[in-house]
């Protein structure tokens, strides 16, 4: 396999298109948070600050509005505010970051060290108290990053315990795939009956190597995180489509979904680079990324990532039908973020393979 620079460049054009046509006053929400974090990581990989003005404008806007941080999804923007604080030293970026940290440190725990995913938000007061696998990306990645860079050993340990605790609640030990949530009152993962959401398993595969980067391989929790990552990767290899994509439901007939595909590609390439996976995963990882790029649409109207399922929750009633009924869209923020993460890892692989 050969590295094709045009694949990386196409994703960069997508990032440029989004930042040049979108209002930086994006939502204070998880999808926008991941997009902003991915843009800053893309800048870091390229040795640039191309997207800093866009992301700093986002922070400036929310510094005036003073957003609520009341759930994992509204803690995720700490990824942007912390990145911009490191870039600029701006006091308001630090204040917003500290607000997220206060939530992480002081929000009551729901089960073990884990928080109610929907927190004290309006949705959290209606939906059953539960831990969601989404939190591994929306909550644990930032926590591990901030803690490691600021020598906060207590917070590092807290973040490092999260993957094992999520596994105790949501990992199907027979299939080695992850349920979307764990309902605490029932004491069970939900949904059941081998309903495994593709993007949720993508969060795991993309986030675990990020967390390992942050806590370090000498941390006592690292070996178990790697083992969980490997077993789920093996399971995912067994449900991959012939075109190297993944469906929105991994073991049931459903449509192919490219945010999950991009997340898994990114996580596999990251894991191969760090030695967690062997070379057997390389071709599937590369082909998955290339398939996502091939599915992009580019014309005078713009450039778009396609086949991204809309925001998804584990519906209390008829959850399998609920996943299947979520419509596909283009350029959803979290889907673009996933593709950028994969493009970054693809570029790293290309650089390493050329040396």
Residue ranges of each PLM-predicted region?
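Inter-helical turn/loop segments and adjacent helix faces that build the functional surface
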Residues: 146-157, 211-223, 271-279
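A non-catalytic, amphipathic alpha-helix used as a structural packing/dimerization or gating element
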Residues: 13, 54-57, 99, 158-161, ...
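Extended ligand-binding groove/face enriched in aromatic
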Residues: 52-53, 64-185, 190-192, 298, ...
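Hydrophobic alpha-helical packing residues
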Residues: 18, 104, 166, 211, ...
């Amino acid at each position: 396999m050969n590295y094709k620079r045009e694949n990386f460049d196409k994703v960069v054009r997508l990032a440029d298109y989004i930042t040049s046509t979108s209002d930086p006053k994006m939502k204070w929400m998880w999808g926008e948070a991941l997009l902003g974090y991915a843009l800053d990581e893309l800048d870091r990989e390229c040795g640039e600050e191309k997207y800093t003005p866009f992301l700093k404008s986002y922070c400036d806007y929310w510094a005036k509005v003073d957003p609520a941080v009341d759930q994992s999804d509204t803690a995720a923007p700490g990824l942007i505010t912390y990145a911009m604080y490191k870039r600029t030293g701006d006091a308001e970026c630090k204040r917003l970051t500290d607000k997220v940290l206060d939530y992480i440190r002081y929000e009551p725990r729901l089960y073990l060290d884990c928080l109610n995913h929907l927190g004290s938000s309006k949705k959290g007061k209606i939906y059953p108290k539960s831990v969601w696998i989404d939190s591994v990306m929306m909550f644990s990645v930032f926590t591990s990053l901030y803690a490691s860079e600021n020598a906060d050993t207590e917070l590092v340990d807290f973040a490092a315990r999260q993957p094992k605790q999520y596994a105790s609640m949501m990992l199907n030990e027979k299939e080695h795939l992850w349920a979307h949530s764990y309902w605490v009152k029932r004491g069970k993962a939900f949904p059941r009956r081998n309903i495994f959401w593709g993007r949720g398993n993508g969060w795991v595969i993309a986030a675990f190597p990020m967390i390992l980067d942050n806590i370090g391989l000498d941390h006592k929790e690292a070996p178990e995180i790697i083992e969980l990552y490997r077993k789920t990767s093996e399971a995912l290899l067994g449900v991959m489509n012939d075109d190297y994509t993944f469906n929105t439901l991994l073991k049931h007939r459903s449509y192919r979904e490219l945010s999950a595909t991009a997340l898994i590609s990114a996580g596999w390439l990251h894991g191969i680079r760090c030695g967690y996976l062997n070379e057997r995963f390389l071709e599937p990882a590369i082909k998955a990324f290339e398939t996502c790029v091939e599915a992009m649409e580019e014309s005078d109207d713009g450039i778009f990532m396609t086949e991204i399922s809309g925001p998804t929750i584990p519906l209390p009633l008829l959850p399998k039908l609920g996943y299947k009924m979520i419509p596909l869209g283009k350029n959803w923020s979290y889907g673009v973020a996933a593709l950028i993460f994969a493009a970054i890892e693809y570029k790293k692989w290309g650089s390493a393979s050329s040396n």
